Amino acid sequence: MTALKKAGLLRTYYRDRLRGYRLGAKAKLVLLDGWPERFTFCLTGDAETNRLKSEANRRFRLHRLAETYITIGNAGVLLYPDEKPKVFAQTGFGGEAVTYPVFYSSREVKELGADATQIRSSRFAGVLLAPTGIFVTYNSGGALMKWRYKSELRVKTLLWNILCQQRLAQQYRVEQVHGLVLGDSMDLAYQILTSTGGAKHDYFMLDGSYDHFYFLTNDHQGEVILALLCDPVKTAELDRILSQGLSAGNPGSAMEQDAAEPDGTPVLFGYFCDLPRIVRFNTALELMERPGTLICFDFQADVLRHYCGDRVHLQTIDFTKFEGRLFP
């Protein structure tokens, strides 16, 4: 940072007792001269990201977006416009399939033009397209984010129409659109699991907008699990390892489960922290007054144990050993 500031590429900005860094004109020219196909999109014309955003809430929003890009980029997902198909462009999309994990920011999605006017009030950071599905991505930071059910449902509906029924209809089905929320720590996962939306019902809660809503942390552990979420082959290998000594779950059962203990105790693979699925599993166990087993990573265990209580037995996966085996 010091070297960039001395070179005149970064400048410090203070307002409302918050310090930030901004690209100087020299830095923008360097990026545009060196990689025009990558940075013209966001550094020229009347681009939204080229405007100064000095209000505290807008600066925090930009920080969360930048944090999202770092987490997703470190998971091996492609981010830059020149690396991916122009799926959301009004013109220029050639109908090519998405064969690798790619992320489109909310601003890129809004390139659709008139079709995107209905989602302007959404809190989503962008959309992750992976072989395993479409993930509408949010970053809640360290606390519950503001949430408007109808606004977020419009995002889901737009993706159904544009991706599942039009541009990528051969690749994705409507049931493959899921939610993904990033947070600073697993403590936020507990807040989400127990949230009722606040007094005005305007904070994030599991309101049924997505049947599957994954929670990942903005750290190395979250990055590795995100890479796993995008990789169906490695996910299948982990499931195979976890299934050793277990029998197949009952697909006809009303209870959410992935396997069963030899004595019939239902088992859920909860390592992706699919929060609605964990809620459904725990609720079913309570209604049936029976025990269950939840398998998760070691760093997720305390929060999930706190939420599920004594009825659920937790088995943990050593994250370090897992990473060494599947992501050496």
Residue ranges, per PLM feature:
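Electropositive, intrinsically flexible nucleic-acid-contacting patches
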Residues: 18, 41-52, 66-71, 86-94, ...
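Well-ordered, non-membrane alpha-helical segments in soluble/globular domains
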Residues: 62-68, 148-167, 195-199, 275-282
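A short, polar/proline- and glycine-enriched secondary-structure boundary/capping micro-motif
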Residues: 31-35, 42, 146-150, 280-281
